[in-house]
């Protein structure tokens, strides 16, 4: 899972405070490889990374399969509450 984050991003803060901190979400994330791209500086490299994944800005969460291919249709753009994010995680981890 690749999560795009920035300190100035209000929705990113909501994801951290409400969704990623939820014990049910944490349990589902256990065992997954979690990466966070901090694009706070909005540098050329940050913008290039966002562009590479066709994102306008954070927050954005992208899921990959065991072979490193993006799981199409499961991107999370913007804030998702814990219940909705759990449904997304279930789809991402389905066999």
Which residues are covered by each model-predicted region?
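Short, solvent-exposed loop/turn and secondary-structure capping segments
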Residues: 13-14, 47, 73-75
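Non-catalytic, surface beta->alpha helical segment in thiol-disulfide oxidoreductase systems
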Residues: 19-24, 56-95
